[in-house]
Amino acid sequence: FNQTVDLSSFGTYAMVAYSSLDTDFDPTNDLWQSSITNINCSPVADCAGYDDGFQLFQLADIDNPSGCEGGYSYFSNLCTDLVVGDTYDVTVTTGYGDQHVRIWIDYNDDFIFSLDEMVVSDYEIANGQGQGSYTETFQMTIPEGAVLGTHIMRIKSNWQSQVPDDACEDTTYGETEDYTVNLVTSLGFGDFELNNSELIIYSTDNK
């Protein structure tokens, strides 16, 4: 028999197959069990020894001060809407200088962060600096035509050299963090600020 299942969501899946034929005289081989675990690639890097990596990441509604979690963290609960075609400020704090940063958005949801999904190619924080606290802000543009909907966004750092093209590659010093972004065509009216605006209310026929 043929049976297809959707294993696209992260987690562990239990697989069980069982046969119960009347003419089966060997019941010892009737049951097959296995498990499949689907996780995003989690690169290894040292972000604790010298405070490399990210101590703060801010983008739109995401404001995440964090420590080192073995070089990789998936903040699946942190999500923000981003409008296709718009440019956003990204603020990052690191604990060591010479940190190169790249950002990808997995538009096709295949868990492979390819070069054409890169939205920040190479930004260096605190060039030539050593240990300390460095905060810098740079810009990220969501390209026109990007696939709408919810996707994983990966930000990755590497000390003293450009982040590898392979977003799953381990590095000696740095950190990788994954977030969730929701790409939309425009924000609702409630998302627009009306600071310093003058509102005039008209009454028509006492209604």
Stretch-by-stretch model annotation:
Residues F1-S9:
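Intrinsically disordered, low-complexity Pro/Gly/Ser/Thr-rich segments with frequent PxxP/GP/PP motifs
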Residues L7, A14-T28, K156-D165:
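Enriched for extracellular/lumenal, surface-exposed ectodomains of secreted and cell-surface proteins
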Residues S9-Y13, A146-G149:
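Short tyrosine-centred short linear motifs in exposed loops/low-complexity segments
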Residues M15, D30, S34, M153, ...:
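Extracytoplasmic/periplasmic beta-strand context in beta-sandwich domains
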Residues T23-W32, D170-E175:
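Short, exposed coil/turn segments at beta-strand boundaries within extracellular/luminal domains
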Residues D30-L31, G132-Y134, D205-K207:
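Ser/Thr- and Asn-enriched, surface-exposed coil loops between beta-strands
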Residues I39-L187:
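A broad "non-catalytic interaction surface" signal
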Residues T80-V83, L187-K207:
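Surface-exposed, proline-anchored Ser/Thr-rich loop/turn motifs
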